[in-house]
């Protein structure tokens, strides 16, 4: 022994933790030598033939240099760096350099005079920091020598935690400074022989994770597991490509989202590659991005995003859609375009567009196809706007080639303000339009009844205050809009509430004499009414019923005249089925309304002749009603609201009795009545965003009539009283409702004729029963037929 060197023999571990200054060198022939202090290795050469571990939590000095022979390993523990002074680091072929790193590790980790590299480099216990994009990739300076580094490691192994598969680390001599050795973050797509992982094209991102590739992805040399030119997206996270990528292989979006932004391009112009979007996955692009190749979509294809207006996403190739295509535009600012420079085939897929529902020039998302359109695609429109009459319509699909007549089918009901929009194929230009237009006489196939036009075209449509979404534009043609069906449901609820407050003295009282002690009575009424709205464009069929109870609470008489005061209450229930006018495509929609509630009231009647009721009479009543209303209308769903009504009536008449020779009597009673009504309903905002109100208002109804009734006597007692009554009714104002300030009215005839017939039978001096059938008719196909049954008991 020379007295100044150290040799490690045997399989065990030797730990040096002192402040050593021997100069003869250190030889490790077997086992493990651990340098636990920064000066544990003295000043001589360290000749490593086994295992050297530097674990001093600081910078270990090895100023004599370190040589690691084939089969041997030199390891730098976490927190330990190495200073070789002016000496060399030699890693022979077959050797291993193992370093442990984290984000706090010092740079450079190894300094010295020179380095000769070979064998394997192993990086342990490291983690790659999450990056938002490849533009944030960083390098770690592993070595910084005084002279250029020679040789290189033959392999790099990264024992990383939480390493995304699309990221790798490559060990390289700095091309700008050959004295430095760098560990550089990069894409697995670009991996080389000295990268930690083999090159591949798979990008896996977990739920909530996102990553952007700003660099250009081009074709690479393939290996046994990858062709060097195909991209696969896995995981629920989002991958964004913002470079003008030139790779020529297929793009397979199997999970999560693949998005193109900025200059994002897949393939070079003329490329025949394919983009395949699997079920449950999403693919799309922002304005100006392009796919050169064929796209097959079984998942979701998105064009544009909510932060853009007027975005164009271009597909230079055919598109087959078996999934969902949707605009990423905000519903308030539509205008994105999916541009397909090729043919389009819909294999049961769907297309969702945002559209401002107005006239022909309204903003909309759009699908543009330079080639042919075939197959079948379900179209869904998310609409905003106040609605307007269209002529040709809003172009939503532009086909440069030939389109089959069933290539696109509108699947949801589209309403705005008063109007219903449908999808139409223009055979002359093969384009598809969203239009609000009714079926004309030329369009009528005769298969179903088309609602009457009701005479004056548009006469019952009041333009809104802002100037005119409702008034049809003058394009020189007779184009009528298709109206939404629930117009009639709202009107029907209002009309039924008003109608079931109406009554006359004889509807309520019959013809029986009432004594001063008063009486109680009950009435049941049921009927069916038919009417139109919006100049015949809406058909309304209503079925209604009413049960009413009343009784006298005060009676006064002086032997000849009498005054009776009473109270009454009723329950009403009415259903209205509303059918909209038929669109030019033959479509027709229905809606239903229901109103039920209660009327509470008082009445007062004066008879000039309390005994026979002949001569003059005056009857008055007041009612207050409160109701629950509902409207059910297709895609708009169900809406509920409350309403109230007040009514005041004043009626007078004069009865003339004519005695017949057989002892019976015929009476003639001319009558006049005036009724004031006030109706008020809550405002409603439906699922389309349309505000429905404007139902508050007053109306006057006047009636002039003649009643004829007879008295058939048995002995001194009246047994049967047949009667008939003819009336002329005049109403001052129509039932109306507003949709986003556009007001429409029911086609209720201002003048109506009414006929009532019936029988009253006196069971005895106290009980009487009466049955009546009544009907009304008028213009605009108005009709009302009802029957009622009355029962009265006199005290």
Predicted features and spans:
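Extracellular/surface-exposed low-complexity segments
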Residues: 1-3, 100-102, 113, 118-228, ...
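Extracellular repeat-rich scaffold modules on cell surfaces
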Residues: 1-46, 67-68, 186-275, 374-381
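Glycine-centered positions in the ABC transporter ATPase nucleotide-binding domain
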Residues: 12, 31-33, 50-52, 72, ...
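Extracellular beta-strand/loop-rich repeat segments of large surface/secreted proteins
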Residues: 53-138, 204-207, 282-394
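Transmembrane beta-strand segments of Gram-negative outer membrane beta-barrel proteins
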Residues: 202-211, 349-352, 485, 511-528, ...
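Outer membrane beta-barrel translocator domains of Type V secretion systems
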Residues: 240-242, 464-660, 772-774, 779-786, ...
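Residue-level detector of the transmembrane beta-barrel scaffold of outer-membrane proteins
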Residues: 352, 519-523, 564-568, 603, ...
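Outer membrane beta-barrel transmembrane domains
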Residues: 577, 601, 678, 687, ...
